[in-house]
Amino acid sequence: MKMEVSFPGGKRVYSDFNGFTVETDQNEKDGGDNSAPTPSDLFFVSIGTCAGIYALNFCEKRNIDPTHVKIEVEFQANQKSNMIEKVIFNVDLAPEYPEKYISALIKSMNLCYVKKHFEQPPQFEFVTNNDVKF
């Protein structure tokens, strides 16, 4: 699995991955044009949408209307470091949602591939074209 990162101008950074070009930019206060999400935005979005696709698949397999499930993700940051310390998935279920599937729905969302990377984080290595590793 590989990704190519490019710099098309300004504070924009693009990533070509799995046949898609994902565009990012910085906010105006950080010198960008605010023309696309920031990399951090996409990071947070990936957590919510990952849990969301697991919830959607769970509902579809059981013929449950997915509009009966609303997910709101809350990120709590450390005030000094600004690092996220807690991610809370608030799952709002409509009265029509079958009670017998509540626990199973949450368990399915807990299988999120992105979330699992927090539980078992990868190692990061930087290598230059002259094989210097950092």
What are these regions (language model features)?
Residues 50-51:
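Alpha-helical metal-binding/catalytic segments enriched in His/Glu/Asp
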Residues 1-45, 55-134:
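Extended beta-strand/beta-hairpin segments
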